[in-house]
């Protein structure tokens, strides 16, 4: 290479760089590195979408021009001098010549495949490209994995024996097919829930296991149930094939199979797509990983964008090793780290960096910003979930009074059931809010079902609620029979319940009369128990005797487990109601209280409201002020992660995602004790809080000396005898030496758990007794109100004023003086 060629290549690179001078150096490098495999490790808030857009634009304008020493056109001193002059004084009229001189095999739009994870992201990519480049950008293949695969299959699925005009079955279609198969095989849906079967089949397809391989695997292991599921899987595939239909898993599976089995088809697409870009690569599963490799031709021009520290969808099949092993899969791969953050303050980033640094399975990067230090992260230790909710809502109200908008605030939690106490506090204070990616607690179907049971028990004349739950769970009382009973009730001017109780009197109800009367007897038995039992315990009986809990337990899929948690969480609402010292602490009083707050749900300004969501739902979003609640061991990280390194690292990544949603302030809360799913347990701070450096946070209400809780392993997953009890496991506290921030508290199963012991009897207290509380200090008991197997006590504390506490829950923290 002579001097002129060196000058030209250097000038060409600098001229192209001028188009992207507004990008930071690493972003610019990600745009201009066009050839070969490239891993873009894009930290939270680092502007990865901007890099993707500009990278595609660069490929269409200049092709390999920024990343090659090739000179495809004859050059002279004039061409080199022109580019050097353009660099010194770029003029718009010079651009056409500059682009001609700098372009080396510019890509045509249809030669670029950009894979995103959502249709919205694909649409945004095309829209921004069109604004930048004009209509030619619309021919870029910007699509989700499924959409891209459908286009491939519409052209070539006949090679697999399908007609190109295949049908795509959605989840409801697949459910109907499974239900028909269960009938054909004589299998009960209770034993083989449809959702579970579809989940198992989906997993098998994701692992590229055919029905025959699946059956053989589980026959060898002697698993009768899985072998039966294998037969369902086989018939399911047959029925879809007969209907010339694919489900969502088939779309990618058949594309991979096609590309693996047909060299001509594979070569066609490898030649067609000169450049492949895949966003959110950390969330890809095994099939998507295989597909990416099959589409990448000999040129090896695959660019994957992702953040291993934000891989949080393992439960959906995402495999973090896809991004961690990218450089091993593509030997000559280059890696560029996007570490400059444009969203958060340095204190927030330092805290998040410190937390995620404890993970071993990561590539490693450190986020930084020019936004300034900002406020330290606030950690607040509250007494219980009600205090936590009141603190968060109070803080948000304070910001609002100082001029902030409601919409500037977001509250994140690990699981949907945690929204209950927060919603109660928002409604009580008339603060507008919305739930994203979920349904408000009292609007959830299972919660409405249980409230309907309580309403009918309280008022059997409530025909509306009665019709809702008479056949939930199924009692084989058909809709036609209910309509007949309703007609009789209307003719006689009596409530529907009166007819149901004596259904055998009416010949037209003969087919369902016995089952109707059984239901009526159930309601009457529960009505008699209502006055005998404390309200929380009574609710537990309703859940058991109605068969509702058993119904959810038998389904035993992810959705049913979530619904079961919500049914359990309603017990927490009842306890919170009782602790609020209501005028009418009866079932009727609770139902009135619920009705009042649910009626306040409608908001006049749906846009300007506080956002509540799970941490998973928050991915990709950002807010000025973020509150991360439930930072307790056993809640976050959850108990399922204890002792499982991969699960624990996934939880830590989820914490990192939650923390990096915040722009200006980040507040994280934990409690000393939490009632969740109807059970109250003492809590210790999440290990993730302990991993935040002292210089980046302020901890309000932190107990000194620090207490560590040791738990037994006897978590009571059944509900027999569990209602209204203080804890599912016993605990003890032990003094722990103060440790430095640089060396976080070490957590192991051995130090957190202790052997189970019998539940301690209730402390005997009377009005006038002096007590000391570990959080509230010294105080005097004002009143003691027995409540079933518990008691509600009112204590006037010297420092914090009057508090109402359930004695079972508070007993561990109280000492009688």
List each model region and its residues.
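Hydrophobic residues in beta-strands of the RecA-like P-loop NTPase core, especially within AAA+ ATPase
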Residues: 270, 277-284, 305-306, 628
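Acidic, low-complexity intrinsically disordered tails
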Residues: 1-14, 70-103, 694-774, 780-785, ...
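Conserved helicase C-terminal RecA-like lobe
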Residues: 218-222, 405, 419-431, 444, ...
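Conserved helicase motor core of SF1/SF2 NTP-dependent helicases
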Residues: 282-361, 365-370, 487-490, 498, ...
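ATP-hydrolysis module of ASCE/P-loop NTPase motor domains
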Residues: 30, 34, 117, 137-140, ...
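P-loop NTPase Walker
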Residues: 1-164, 168, 267, 321, ...
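Helicase P-loop NTPase motor core
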Residues: 49-52, 67, 75-76, 81, ...
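Conserved helicase/translocase P-loop NTPase motor core
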Residues: 22, 86-97, 145-149, 227-275, ...
